């Protein structure tokens, strides 16, 4: 289900970044550069939410809020304010603002507020947590809930697509820090020369293009939890700096001389065997032991047969809502195919299969052919290859030692991460060459401007501060 949002922001770069975020979230929007320009748009179109900056030339966000409250009393308004102006934002909520965001903020924080105020959805519900009907999954979830109550560092291992970030978010939600930020940063998706400034922040003038100081992800997560996703992809040089942050619980921005104290909980994920990476010299041994205080191994989907259908039903509900479909159900034969499939791509592959089936199904009942599990769309469908069901695990809690990854997993995972990182680097380099001009950059890349906007939104969703590091050396 999509919201229709009116975005009011005078800063062009930020307006484009917010537009990209709304686009990635699947929402409709109209973006204007002033409160004065917003008024005629409001008069001719219906919106489910207004997102407005506070400090703008001419009519500011507070004045716009007052007019909207008078003319459109049921239209929620979300205000964006600078770090030092929180008091005024709180006062605006007393005057009728639905909520506020303090800059800089994560894309997920914006999308959560859009879902809450425009669509009436509460983020972090049961529909977002781990599915654990398999006995081994339930036991692992119990361990996760127990360690959540402490501040211990947790290392979550598992194949790509198993839902490691979902488990990490569950640990955060079960912890005393649940009401504080949860910041996830994908170490595999960000080019090496941008990762340090993304994690630790930078001061004004610390490199070419650093026109203003920016806090890093560690600072943004202060008081809450930071997730270092795919930590095994972090360069060795940066691993030493991360080790110091974990030991001292303080961070130094790039170009700064004074450290900043942190109150933070650290979680990390990996799809590799970190012990083997240490032995091969690709990962620091001291950092490995600092991270693996409490290791958890999230099993691949093929070893969690009891979780497959509940996951499929959840994904069916989720994507049915997004596609504005009526009631759609899994047919018994389709359900059997799902349980028998090997799922080399894990939950991510299951998600894709459900989306395909919703597009292809007719009459509200998904059949095996709609899933396209064993052949590309348009090719004859072969019978699914059955996999042997694993034996029932013992009643005692499972070991939390990190298992070796499945054969072939490292190569495919590393290849995918490397290709994504190279793609992002090519996009950044092309934008530098074109001095930030998106239309020209898209032409040089051979893609449409809309595709470029989507790629930039993906980069921001992976934790990259595109604007801040566009001209970084």
Curated annotation (Swiss-Prot):
<keyword id="KW-0067">ATP-binding</keyword>
<feature type="domain" description="Response regulatory">
    <location>
        <begin position="4"/>
        <end position="118"/>
    </location>
</feature>
<dbReference type="GO" id="GO:2000155">
    <property type="term" value="P:positive regulation of cilium-dependent cell motility"/>
</dbReference>
<dbReference type="GO" id="GO:0005524">
    <property type="term" value="F:ATP binding"/>
</dbReference>
<dbReference type="GO" id="GO:0016887">
    <property type="term" value="F:ATP hydrolysis activity"/>
</dbReference>
<keyword id="KW-0547">Nucleotide-binding</keyword>
<protein>
    <recommendedName>
        <fullName>Response regulator protein FleR</fullName>
    </recommendedName>
</protein>
<keyword id="KW-0597">Phosphoprotein</keyword>
<dbReference type="GO" id="GO:0000987">
    <property type="term" value="F:cis-regulatory region sequence-specific DNA binding"/>
</dbReference>
<dbReference type="GO" id="GO:0000160">
    <property type="term" value="P:phosphorelay signal transduction system"/>
</dbReference>
<comment type="function">
    <text>Member of the two-component regulatory system FleS/FleR that regulates the expression of multiple genes involved in flagellar synthesis, adhesion, swarming, motility and antibiotic resistance. May function as a transcriptional activator by direct binding to a cis-acting sequence upstream of the target genes.</text>
</comment>
<dbReference type="InterPro" id="IPR011006">
    <property type="entry name" value="CheY-like_superfamily"/>
</dbReference>
<feature type="binding site">
    <location>
        <begin position="221"/>
        <end position="230"/>
    </location>
    <ligand>
        <name>ATP</name>
    </ligand>
</feature>
<dbReference type="Pfam" id="PF00072">
    <property type="entry name" value="Response_reg"/>
</dbReference>
<dbReference type="InterPro" id="IPR002078">
    <property type="entry name" value="Sigma_54_int"/>
</dbReference>
<keyword id="KW-0804">Transcription</keyword>
<dbReference type="GO" id="GO:0045893">
    <property type="term" value="P:positive regulation of DNA-templated transcription"/>
</dbReference>
<dbReference type="GO" id="GO:0032993">
    <property type="term" value="C:protein-DNA complex"/>
</dbReference>
<dbReference type="GO" id="GO:0045785">
    <property type="term" value="P:positive regulation of cell adhesion"/>
</dbReference>
<dbReference type="InterPro" id="IPR027417">
    <property type="entry name" value="P-loop_NTPase"/>
</dbReference>
<feature type="binding site">
    <location>
        <begin position="158"/>
        <end position="165"/>
    </location>
    <ligand>
        <name>ATP</name>
    </ligand>
</feature>
<dbReference type="InterPro" id="IPR002197">
    <property type="entry name" value="HTH_Fis"/>
</dbReference>
<feature type="modified residue" description="4-aspartylphosphate">
    <location>
        <position position="53"/>
    </location>
</feature>
<dbReference type="InterPro" id="IPR003593">
    <property type="entry name" value="AAA+_ATPase"/>
</dbReference>
<feature type="domain" description="Sigma-54 factor interaction">
    <location>
        <begin position="130"/>
        <end position="359"/>
    </location>
</feature>
<dbReference type="GO" id="GO:1900191">
    <property type="term" value="P:negative regulation of single-species biofilm formation"/>
</dbReference>
<dbReference type="Pfam" id="PF02954">
    <property type="entry name" value="HTH_8"/>
</dbReference>
<dbReference type="InterPro" id="IPR025662">
    <property type="entry name" value="Sigma_54_int_dom_ATP-bd_1"/>
</dbReference>
<keyword id="KW-0238">DNA-binding</keyword>
<dbReference type="InterPro" id="IPR009057">
    <property type="entry name" value="Homeodomain-like_sf"/>
</dbReference>
<keyword id="KW-0805">Transcription regulation</keyword>
<dbReference type="GO" id="GO:0001216">
    <property type="term" value="F:DNA-binding transcription activator activity"/>
</dbReference>
<dbReference type="InterPro" id="IPR025944">
    <property type="entry name" value="Sigma_54_int_dom_CS"/>
</dbReference>
<dbReference type="InterPro" id="IPR001789">
    <property type="entry name" value="Sig_transdc_resp-reg_receiver"/>
</dbReference>
<dbReference type="Pfam" id="PF00158">
    <property type="entry name" value="Sigma54_activat"/>
</dbReference>
<dbReference type="InterPro" id="IPR025943">
    <property type="entry name" value="Sigma_54_int_dom_ATP-bd_2"/>
</dbReference>
<keyword id="KW-0902">Two-component regulatory system</keyword>
